[in-house]
A protein has these predicted regions:
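Conserved N-terminal glycine/acidic-rich loop preference
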Residues: 1, 8, 35-57
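Conserved active-site tyrosine of GNAT-family acetyltransferases
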Residues: 17-22, 101
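N-terminal beta-strand motif that seeds the catalytic metal site of vicinal oxygen chelate
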Residues: 1-18, 82-89, 135-136
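Short, solvent-exposed interaction modules
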Residues: 72-92, 97-99
Length: 136
């Protein structure tokens, strides 16, 4: 069974987005800014009382998956293409869930040695998902 963990929003300016969530929603930074070398983006977790509600990510280059998605959905109402990027879930049996997805024709991506994996958007009605093991 999947348990919702947090969602990730792609933004064009991480610093201004952090301030926006602090001012509008009273959230606090739960983590320091972190750089992800694989996806080439910077991120920060936001939430309340040390608990993550959402992650904000900003692409570090123009040719990343995050940047390409933002460019593809930019329009006159959303000139920077910002918006929900990923839904993160936790599960007791990530291996079983991965096998179920693949045995039913779904596509997943994972790095060697990692228990978390990503569900390709074409397999989940274009909702990019990360499934990670529950801590403990």
């Amino acid at each position: 069974m999947l348990e919702f963990k947090h969602y990730t929003i792609a933004v064009h300016n991480l610093e201004s987005a952090v301030e926006n969530y602090k001012n509008l929603f009273g959230m606090e930074s739960v983590t320091e800014t972190e750089h992800n070398d694989i996806g080439n983006f910077d991120s920060i977790s936001m939430g309340y009382d040390g608990n993550t509600v959402l992650r904000l990510i900003e692409s570090s280059a123009d040719d990343t998956a995050v940047a390409r998605l933002m460019k593809s959905r930019a329009n006159e109402f959303n000139p920077n293409g910002e918006g929900v990027y990923l839904l993160a879930f936790e599960a007791d049996d990530t291996e079983g869930i991965a096998q179920r997805i693949e045995s039913n024709g779904g596509r997943i991506t994972r790095l060697p040695g990692r228990k978390n994996f990503f569900v390709h958007p074409t397999s989940s009605n274009f909702g990019f998902m990360e499934i990670m093991p529950k801590p403990g």
